[in-house]
C-alpha cells in the first residue's frame, strides 16, 4: 500500500474475476485507505471500465469514482484525503 492507496491490476480478468478481486479489496481496506486504484487498461475495450462504474458507482463504501484521462484506470474514492 502506498500512503492510503491500494492498487489492483485487472489485466486479463473477466467481470466475474474482477468483482471477486475488488470486493475482497474493499473488505480489506482499513481506515487508512482512502482510494483504490484499479488498472484495467483500455486497448482491450471498455467492458471492465464500464462494469466497474456500473457495479461500484453506487456502492455504499464508495463516495465517487474517477477515470484517468486515458481511460485505463478507475479509482474508487472511499473517503476524501485531507
Map each language-model feature to its residues:
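Long, charged, low-complexity intrinsically disordered regions
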Residues: 1-82
Amino acid at each position: 500500500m502506498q500512503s492510503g492507496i491500494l492498487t489492483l491490476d485487472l489485466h486479463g480478468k473477466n467481470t466475474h474475476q474482477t468483482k471477486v478481486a475488488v470486493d475482497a479489496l474493499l473488505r480489506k481496506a482499513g481506515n487508512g485507505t482512502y482510494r483504490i486504484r484499479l488498472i484495467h487498461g483500455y486497448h482491450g475495450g471498455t467492458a471492465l471500465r464500464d462494469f466497474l462504474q456500473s457495479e461500484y458507482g453506487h456502492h455504499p463504501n464508495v463516495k465517487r469514482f474517477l477515470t484517468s484521462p486515458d481511460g485505463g484506470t478507475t479509482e474508487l474514492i472511499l473517503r476524501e484525503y485531507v
